[in-house]
Amino acid sequence: MIGRRPQGLRAAASLKKQQQLEKQKQEASYELSGNSSPSKENGSENVDNGEMEDETMLVYTEEDNISQLWGLYEMSREKLENDDIDASVSLVFGTIHEADRILRNTEDISTLPKDFHAAYSSALLAVSELFEIAQKRLKETNTEESYIDAAIERAQLGLDAPGNESRLFLALARAYLEKVRVLVWRHDNEESLANIPVTQLVNPYIEKAIQYLRPLAQDSTEYFDALTPDSLRPLYILSSYLFQFGDQFSEAFLLDVCSIITALWLKSVVDPNTPAYYKLIAQEAVLNNYTTFAEYYMDLLDNSESNVDDLINKASSWLNNSVDTWNVIYTLDKSPERLLKLADIKMDLAQIVQDEASQDNYLKEACNAIKEAQGSGVELSPDYVEFVEAYSA
């Protein structure tokens, strides 16, 4: 159970949400110029609190205090997207500050909904993401990993809270995947961990992340506003890890995780009003997922003397899915550099097909794509130049 914070002044009147958000934004920039971090008393025991307490309370109503908290956090993400990192950091600390205030002014903290814990956890995780800049405002005892641990702990405290679980599950999964990223880095750079298999260190966190991602991936047509390309960036960690250590997992497990990752990316842009830029990010992630799996089967094909036809069919299927997704991407962005990706896929198809006619057709399509890119001003690497010269000879 979370320890109670000192009771501050009670909220009284009601202001419009936007007025409150603007006031919070200004206060975040003003109050957080010094140290700021979550408190042990709030269940974030791995992080010291360097914030000066201020008993001047903002105005809250029962129905909108949590939405205001999310508003602050979302404003921080918008600032980050616009490369205003300092403002993003201020708003992240502002979110943590306001979460603390809500705790201080809640008589029964068990009534706080899951969305509160999700917002608090997401803000803590954002500190770890922006740690290089944020650490200027933190105590020396704080570390990037301590904020990830605090984010996990805060989200876990919300599992028994009332309310919808979607945002909380997303916050938990993201925090577990960031933990994977840090542990892989530590394994590569710290002698004390060098003798421990990296899978032993991180697989428990992978399993926990998947546990919370799976229900979010169900019903890919259902709109979920917190599921955005920005919130799904930790999925790159999962994809990269599984690709790097794919031989440690069963084919069934990899396929299962691939389907979850793909479903989440597609679900993030299911809203017809989704900006084209977000659609592009999501489709590129799906394409990366497909080509990664194609390479997985091609590697198996290179090292197997049995089930050759089955592996060829599986690799071809993933490569054809890749072509379909590339076509979707090219309708969104016709940058000539993208033609080189199409050429790569076609060359992979040529590598695995068994009849010469199909092979020659794929090589021709690859060559044409490279020439089109070159004709549009793309500077080719020596490998592409060599391929075009060899095929055209």
From Swiss-Prot:
Q: Specify residue ranges for compositional bias: Polar residues.
A: 32-47
Disulfide links within the chain: none
Basic and acidic residues bias spans: 19-28
InterPro entries according to UniProt: Nro1/ETT1, Nro1_C
Protein's UniProt name: Negative regulator of ofd1
Its biological purpose is as follows: Required for correct translation termination. Positive regulator of the stability of the N-terminal transcription factor domain (Sre1N) of sre1 which is released from the membrane and enters the nucleus to activate hypoxic gene expression. Also acts as a direct inhibitor of ofd1. Functions probably by inhibiting the ability of the ofd1 to accelerate Sre1N degradation in absence of oxygen.
Please, which domain of life does this record's source organism belong to?
Answer: Eukaryota
Q: Which Pfam families match?
A: Nro1, Nro1_C
Assembly and interactions? Answer: Interacts with ofd1.
Molecular function via GO: cation binding; enzyme inhibitor activity
Q: Is this entry keyworded Cytoplasm? A: yes
State the family named in the UniProt similarity comment for this chain.
Belongs to the ETT1 family.
Stretches for region Disordered: 1-51
**Keyword line:** Cytoplasm, Nucleus, Transcription, Transcription regulation, Translation regulation
Gene Ontology BP term (one): regulation of translation
Cellular component GO terms, alphabetical? cytosol; nucleus
List the subcellular locations. Answer: Cytoplasm; Nucleus
Q: Does the keyword Aminoacyl-tRNA synthetase apply?
A: no
